[in-house]
Structures are given as structure tokens and as C-alpha cells.
Amino acid sequence: LVLLDIKHINDEEHIKLTGRTNKNILDLAKYLSEIKKPVWIRHVLVPKRNDYDNYLIELDKFIKELDNVYRVEVLPYHTLGVYKWQELGIENHLEEEGIKPPSKERIDNANELLHTKSYTRYLK
């Protein structure tokens, strides 16, 4: 089983969010599908970054192309670890920009658009 985090489906926006391309992540997802390795897709939902409907619909389309996805989880962005960043002297652009955790409505919307309830396969 592989837990695969897809933070953003759009490469340009992924780079803005993480500083890195998503190409390797998406290629790995396709490869894992080819070899039938079970995967749980996890998507950290960040307001004003990757919670827009068009991105969620695009991510859903990508996930549907894979035939090895056992679960899709929406993980709401939170600020519980902000103090760790501060202690390490690492800039947190999301905090600086006032990004807050998503509302229940946005979380529910993401779960609906990503059809998270449709993924109920279990490992044997």
C-alpha cells in the first residue's frame, strides 16, 4: 500500500505551493496503477490554493484514470505545526498570507467533487 499525497494537480500551482514540480508524483501514480500497487490518494485542502472547483474536478479526472485507488482522502490544511516552522526558522508563506483552515462547506465540497465515498476497496 502506498499513501500518495497530491497537493495540487496543476504543475504551475504545485510549484507555487511547494517549490517543486508535481511531475514525479503524477508519474509515480501512473506507474503504481500499471503495476496494480494499491494506493490511497491524500489531498491536503488549502484555501485559496487548491480548493477551487476546477482544480478538484481536474484532480478527480486524473484519479479516475487510475485503477488501483482504494481510498481518496481530503486532509484539511491546519496550523497545528506552525510553531515547528518558527522554531526551525523556516518561512511559512501560507501563514504570512493569512491562509486559514478550510470551512466545513469547502471540505464537504472537496469530498463531493473528488467522490471520496466511491472509494471503498479494501486490501486482501
Predicted regions and their residues:
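Radical SAM enzyme core and accessory elements
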Residues: T116-K124
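Serine/threonine-rich low-complexity intrinsically disordered regions
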Residues: K48, S103, T116-K117
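A generic structural signal for well-ordered alpha-helical segments
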Residues: L32, L114-H115
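Short aromatic/hydrophobic-glycine micro-motifs
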Residues: K37, I90, Y119-T120
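A structural motif corresponding to the C-terminal lobe/cap of the Radical SAM core domain
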Residues: N54, K61-K64, Y70, W85-L113
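Conserved AdoMet/S-adenosylmethionine-binding subsite of the radical SAM
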Residues: L1-L80, K84-E87
